[in-house]
């Protein structure tokens, strides 16, 4: 279940099929940055949508362009920051929480995985202040999601908390509107 792509390498990246991604990349390095005809996603964006670290790492080693945008004008960083727990993740966390806190450790592991993904993209030179079709940066999305793990990473990479989206809101405005006082304080210190 999920998204169906017209480009086989995009579908393989979305489904975490490293073998298929490797085969397509081996055939021609052009496939590493191919854009799907339906929504413009690249294999890197597809892998970031699902948080597939091995695929992202492989594509980055093959020099995938981290700054390519899809039809919504989003980069892989937008999707990495927007990545949430899946329904299955929540189900496992809830079921395993009473069992020796396994659910808690699963939650921490997934959060660390997402942090690692964002770090990889930042280290690869992704434009941290890139805006999508609505004027949102990755920092806007991190603030909306109250992601206190990723916000310091983005700020350290020089994300600008004062960039306004098409609704006239900056990341700081979003944090204040949603009453996320700790995040608002972080953003004020950075600006």
Curated annotation (Swiss-Prot):
It comes from the Eukaryota. SMART domains: ANK (SM00248). Pfam families: Ank_2. ANK repeats lie at residues 39-68, 72-100, 101-130, 134-163. Keywords: ANK repeat, Repeat. SUPFAM superfamilies: Ankyrin repeat. PANTHER family: ANKYRIN REPEAT DOMAIN-CONTAINING PROTEIN 22 (PTHR47276:SF1). This is Ankyrin repeat domain-containing protein 22. It comes from Mus musculus. The lineage of its organism: Eukaryota, Metazoa, Chordata, Craniata, Vertebrata. The gene is Ankrd22.
């Amino acid at each position: 279940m999920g998204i169906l792509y017209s480009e086989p390498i995009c579908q393989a990246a979305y489904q975490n099929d490293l073998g298929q991604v490797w085969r397509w990349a081996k055939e021609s390095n052009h496939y590493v940055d191919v854009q799907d005809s339906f929504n413009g996603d690249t294999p890197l964006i597809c892998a970031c949508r699902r948080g597939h670290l091995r695929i992202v790492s492989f594509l980055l080693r093959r020099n995938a362009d981290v700054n390519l945008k899809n039809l919504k004008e989003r980069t892989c960083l937008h999707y990495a920051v927007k990545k949430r727990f899946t329904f299955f993740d929540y189900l496992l966390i809830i079921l395993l929480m009473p069992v020796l806190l396994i659910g808690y450790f699963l939650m921490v592991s997934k959060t660390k995985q997402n942090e690692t993904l964002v770090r990889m993209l930042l280290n690869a030179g992704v434009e941290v202040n890139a805006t999508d079709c609505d004027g949102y940066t990755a920092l806007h999305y991190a603030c909306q999601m109250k992601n206190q793990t990723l916000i310091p990473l983005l700020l350290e990479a020089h994300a600008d908390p004062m960039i306004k989206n098409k609704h006239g809101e900056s990341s700081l405005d979003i944090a204040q509107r949603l009453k996320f006082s700790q995040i608002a304080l972080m953003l004020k210190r950075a600006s």
